[in-house]
Amino acid sequence: MADLEEQLSDEEKVRIAAKFIIHAPPGEFNEVFNDVRLLLNNDNLLREGAAHAFAQYNLDQFTPVKIEGYEDQVLITEHGDLGNGKFLDPKNRICFKFDHLRKEATDPRPCEVENAVESWRTSVETALRAYVKEHYPNGVCTVYGKKIDGQQTIIACIESHQFQAKNFWNGRWRSEWKFTITPSTTQVVGILKIQVHYYEDGNVQLVSHKDIQDSLTVSNEVQTAKEFIKIVEAAENEYQTAISENYQTMSDTTFKALRRQLPVTRTKIDWNKILSYKIGKEMQNA
């Protein structure tokens, strides 16, 4: 082990540490960071060399953050990344600095938004917030309106998590939806992601995603938003149901094929009585 450590350069150590951090399960960033910190034993090297990993983790996970003075949380995503550690809160029309390690937002300031698409963005956000409130107990959503390749585009992001460290599990749902505002009809593209980590008496991770495509009728802002939410709700309900049914099937078939619940004798052993079984047999043979 010592020889291996001597062979690794600082650059290689940081690269390995960054991979651990980026792949940390939901709600376990701090635990993974602290473990990596102990292994690397060089705080300056870790902070400087793995800073990109901290940022990438928060962007990938749609990390929610509360901005002081504002009621609703906003998601940290690539769509709101303004560069130099600054992010956009499109609902409140503010920009803020975000510390990727501490996960804290500071220095909120007024920020310009894409006015040409703002009425569409607001309508979608209003409808999406009502949907998220109904379906996600801890859900947060952020809706962006921007021009991409000259086209007015709406991007809607949803995040919901449950961190139950005391019960040895953590999980996060993420979904991202996108469509351009074009006459008559447009295509909606979505991706749904689920990640769950269970670590009591074992170490099991569920990592799943599904790509979605559907057609959306474009009329006025409010009606288009309603039709968009119908697509989102149908797809996410179907995905959640499929995941639940799949794991029930695996429990009933695959897991049972991998391991017997009962030993070959088809009877359970009472381990509290195993000693008395042996003593009783020896007494009979005496």
UniProtKB/Swiss-Prot annotation:
Annotated GO MF terms: actin filament binding
Organism name: Homo sapiens
Keywords: Acetylation, Actin capping, Actin-binding, Phosphoprotein
Name the record gives this protein: F-actin-capping protein subunit alpha-2
Pfam families, A to Z: F-actin_cap_A (PF01267)
SUPFAM superfamilies for the chain: Subunits of heterodimeric actin filament capping protein Capz (SSF90096)
UniProt modified residues of type N-acetylalanine: 2
Family: Belongs to the F-actin-capping protein alpha subunit family.
Modified residues (Phosphoserine): 9
GO biological process: actin cytoskeleton organization; barbed-end actin filament capping; protein-containing complex assembly
Oligomeric form and interacting partners: Component of the F-actin capping complex, composed of a heterodimer of an alpha and a beta subunit. Component of the WASH complex, composed of F-actin-capping protein subunit alpha (CAPZA1, CAPZA2 or CAPZA3), F-actin-capping protein subunit beta (CAPZB), WASH (WASHC1, WASH2P, WASH3P, WASH4P, WASH5P or WASH6P), WASHC2 (WASHC2A or WASHC2C), WASHC3, WASHC4 and WASHC5. Interacts with RCSD1/CAPZIP. Directly interacts with CRACD; this interaction decreases binding to actin.
Function: F-actin-capping proteins bind in a Ca(2+)-independent manner to the fast growing ends of actin filaments (barbed end) thereby blocking the exchange of subunits at these ends. Unlike other capping proteins (such as gelsolin and severin), these proteins do not sever actin filaments.
